[in-house]
């Protein structure tokens, strides 16, 4: 088992990574303060892993909420269902919420934990690549609004993140590929050596070799933990983690949440960001080709949706949370392993990239 600590002073917490961790009772017990837990999961994950979790938590009083699966249910209505279940079962401030599922479950359960009685403890138990390498770490919690993704939320850190890599054995191929977009993102924005390692280990990753998967998840979590420790609430360097997301969120919102998976939209968004950087003379064309090839090797899209035009992109991008003083800020790669924030990209350049 590998361990990483997200260093945030009194709110620091461990990330545990390994095989069979859903059965490690001590990992859960050390993060649960009271006697009651509320497990939040969905109709896909619950039949696979809920019974195992309940067996591990046999010493606690357990309630559960099983939600419908999918990004389209990440909304205020579903959020209210979680709160109603907590209230109707008379949960108090010493209840611990356990998010058992992918990014949607983690985001909603975490936001419920942040809001319920002004904050109760929660544990992230991510079951997808995307949630294991990205969304479960760092304390971002949210629900979507019809006008924008993750517009209603809070920064709220978990007590612990427990990553059982065995959960990936039941993950559909499309979901696995979507998660790999966030993995590739770390290589592009922060760690050239990790990007090269990904290029060299495509087969080992796609065949779920435990050593490769464990290292991959650990390295992603190390990078995110380091960045979050420096900038918890995205006032500076943490914004770099949004590489590809300004374009990607526009794709998700315009296409309808769930029609393009988040990782698919981010993959396309990273290519658009890289092409924008190329247009501005910030990055070499050979490195763009490397980025596109690696994204393709994990069966991810490298083009924007054919039915999306510049005006549709721009309307959604204006709602991006990184907009400051009316200026759109873009995260652009200047080389593989390094990104910077730019707030002076002209509409002419953006139009050229999107319509090319």
UniProtKB/Swiss-Prot annotation:
Binding site for NAD(+): 69-74, 103-107, 127-128, 140, 149, 167-170
Ligand binding (Zn(2+)): 182, 245, 262
Cofactor: Co(2+); Zn(2+); NAD(+)
Enzyme Commission number: 4.2.3.4
GO cellular component, one term: cytoplasm
Alphabetical list of Pfam families matching this protein: DHQ_synthase, DHQS_C
Leading EC class: lyase
Cofactor binding remark: Binds 1 divalent metal cation per subunit. Can use either Co(2+) or Zn(2+).
GO terms for MF: 3-dehydroquinate synthase activity; metal ion binding; nucleotide binding
Catalytic activity: 7-phospho-2-dehydro-3-deoxy-D-arabino-heptonate = 3-dehydroquinate + phosphate
Compartments, record wording: Cytoplasm
Pathway the protein takes part in: Metabolic intermediate biosynthesis; chorismate biosynthesis; chorismate from D-erythrose 4-phosphate and phosphoenolpyruvate: step 2/7
Spans traversing the lipid bilayer: none
Job of this protein: Catalyzes the conversion of 3-deoxy-D-arabino-heptulosonate 7-phosphate (DAHP) to dehydroquinate (DHQ).
Family the entry assigns: Belongs to the sugar phosphate cyclases superfamily. Dehydroquinate synthase family.
PANTHER family per the UniProt record, alphabetical: 3-DEHYDROQUINATE SYNTHASE, 3-DEHYDROQUINATE SYNTHASE, CHLOROPLASTIC
Name of the protein in question: 3-dehydroquinate synthase
Record lineage: Bacteria, Pseudomonadati, Pseudomonadota, Gammaproteobacteria, Alteromonadales
């Amino acid at each position: 088992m590998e361990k990483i600590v997200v260093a945030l002073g009194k709110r620091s917490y461990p990330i545990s990574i390994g095989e069979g961790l859903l059965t490690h009772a001590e990992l859960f017990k050390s993060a649960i303060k009271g006697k009651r837990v509320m497990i939040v999961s969905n109709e896909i994950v619950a039949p696979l892993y809920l019974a195992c979790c309940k067996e591990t938590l046999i010493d606690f009083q357990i309630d559960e909420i099983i939600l419908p699966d999918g990004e389209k249910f990440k909304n205020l209505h579903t959020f209210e269902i979680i709160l109603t279940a907590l209230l109707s079962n008379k949960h108090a401030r010493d209840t611990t919420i356990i998010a058992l599922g992918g990014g949607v479950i983690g985001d909603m359960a975490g936001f419920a934990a942040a809001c319920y009685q002004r904050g109760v403890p929660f544990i992230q138990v991510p079951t997808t690549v995307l949630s294991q390498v990205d969304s479960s770490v760092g304390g971002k919690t949210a629900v979507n609004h019809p006008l924008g993704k993750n517009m209603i939320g809070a920064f709220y850190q978990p007590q612990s993140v427990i990553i059982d890599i065995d959960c990936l054995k039941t993950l559909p191929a499309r979901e696995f590929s979507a998660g790999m977009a966030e993995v590739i993102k770390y290589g592009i924005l922060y760690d050239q050596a990790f990007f090269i390692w990904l290029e060299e280990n495509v087969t080992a990753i796609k065949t779920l070799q435990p050593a490769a998967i464990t290292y991959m998840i650990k390295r992603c979590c190390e990078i995110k933990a380091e960045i979050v420790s420096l900038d918890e609430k995205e006032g500076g360097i943490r914004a770099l983690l949004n590489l590809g997301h300004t374009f990607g969120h526009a794709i998700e919102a315009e296409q309808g949440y769930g029609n393009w998976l988040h990782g698919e939209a981010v993959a396309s968004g990273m290519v658009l960001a890289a092409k924008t950087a190329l247009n501005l003379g910030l990055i070499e064309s050979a490195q763009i080709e490397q980025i596109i090839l690696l994204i393709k090797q994990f069966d991810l899209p490298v083009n924007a949706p054919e039915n999306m035009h510049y005006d549709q992109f721009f309307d959604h991008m204006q709602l991006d949370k990184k907009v400051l003083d009316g200026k759109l800020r873009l995260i652009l790669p200047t080389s593989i392993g390094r990104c910077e924030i730019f707030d002076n990209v002209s509409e002419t350049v953006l139009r050229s990239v999107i319509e090319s």
